[in-house]
Regions:
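N-terminal flexible segment immediately upstream of the FAD-binding catalytic core
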Residues: 1-69, 86-118, 133, 147
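Short charge-dense sequence patches
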Residues: 11-22, 76-86, 125, 129-132, ...
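Short, basic and Ser/Thr-rich N-terminal targeting/leader segments
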Residues: 49, 72-74, 81-83, 152, ...
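FAD-binding subdomain of flavoenzyme oxidoreductases
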Residues: 109-195
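Structural motif
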Residues: 26-28, 53-55, 75-79, 85-86, ...
Length: 195
């Protein structure tokens, strides 16, 4: 592992340049370059406010892994974010301006629906409403239902173990999950997907 520059400013600029090289400039949003990034830095109730070093929007699991490796190398903490609909502020950066918000909104696809095995493979940034729609189109039911289903994501549902309106009958989000593909804190991709 390469040592990061010692000064915070140099460390941050080196990280941001590495992120631009890895993801492209369009995937990196900076507070100083945009009028408002409140969508990423303030929760939907306007209760929790933060200031990020940058908002990073990867488009693949490999890009997520690369971001995690770069942030670890530069010792910059990450705040993972789905739809930013949480009630507890966990998806909002602190106000230090030194954290990267890792927004998974571009990882938003239903990859497969297997009606025979009653399973689906979806990306972490996929909206709950899209998962429900894909299941319905296959003649199935994805029973997790929340008021925020048009803006909350499956990754956030799993991270918070969302229950929803049918939790007593069908269980929580984690009980509806057969497996995961995840990126470890070291930036390695762990494949625990099953169908």
């Amino acid at each position: 592992m390469t040592d990061a520059p010692s000064s915070p400013c140099g460390q941050h600029e080196a990280l941001l340049e590495a992120l631009r090289q890895t993801l492209g400039a369009a995937a990196i949003l900076r507070p100083d370059a945009h009028d408002s990034l409140d969508r990423y830095q303030v929760d939907w109730r306007k209760r929790y406010h933060g200031q990020a070093l940058a908002i990073v929007r990867p488009a693949s699991t490999d890009e997520v892994a690369a971001v995690v490796r770069l942030c670890a190398r530069h010792r910059v903490s990450i705040v993972p974010q789905g739809g930013n609909t949480s009630l507890v502020g966990g998806s909002v950066p602190d106000d230090s301006g030194q954290q990267i918000v890792l927004n998974l909104g571009r990882l938003n696809r239903v990859l497969a629906v297997d009606a025979a095995n009653l399973s689906m493979t979806v990306q972490a940034g996929c909206l709950l409403a899209e998962v429900q729609r894909a299941a319905d189109e296959a003649g199935l039911l994805f029973p997790l239902s929340l008021a925020s289903e048009g803006s909350c994501t499956i990754g956030g549902n799993l991270a918070t173990n969302a229950g929803g309106t049918q939790v007593l009958r069908y269980g929580t989000a984690r009980e509806l999950c057969l497996g995961l593909e995840a990126v470890t804190a070291q930036g390695e991709i762990w494949d625990g997907l099953k169908s």
